[in-house]
Amino acid sequence: MPESTILRVMVSAFLVLETANVLALYLAPGSRRFNAVGVFAGWHASTRDADLHAFVRYLVFWVAGTKVIFIGLWLVILLVGDARTQLVASVAMVPAIATFYWRLFPIVRRLDRNGQVEPTGYSSVLGWMIAGFLLAFVVAIAASV
């Protein structure tokens, strides 16, 4: 498989996952599938306060919207970008994805430990899944250099 094809396949798989996440966030934010927020007790607690729930929904849809922008940019990079542009954009993805461990992972881990996430252990699964994507990006980048 040509080097740039490996990278394109990796990015395409990531975009499929992100598209599923966007659909879940927009169409079924309370779902427990993909990265919808139904796994969080706070989502369910917010439904008891209309103003708080409106704010939480706003934040969920804001996240979905930023993912749509991200997906759109990556589609342009895949469709019209040359191999070098795709490589450099993929290199930029590694630290961007890794920011999950800076702010989000400590929060979701604490919520998980405090029984605010169902199923228990969700934070570990999410952490390992993201680590897997990071590793896959690094391998695809290395194969493309």
Residue ranges and their predicted role:
Residues 72-95:
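Juxtamembrane helix-break-helix junctions at the cytosolic face
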Residues 99-114:
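Transmembrane alpha-helical segments of integral membrane proteins
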Residues 2-23:
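Hydrophobic transmembrane alpha-helical segments in integral membrane proteins
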Residues 16-53:
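Hydrophobic transmembrane helix segments
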Residues 38-78:
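Core segments of alpha-helical transmembrane spans in multipass integral membrane proteins
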Residues 118-131:
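Individual transmembrane alpha-helices with interfacial aromatic-anchor signatures
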Residues 10-13, 59-66, 89-95:
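Physicochemical signature of membrane-embedded alpha-helices that form the seven-helix bundle of GPCRs
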Residues 136-145:
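Juxtamembrane boundary at the C-terminal end of a transmembrane helix
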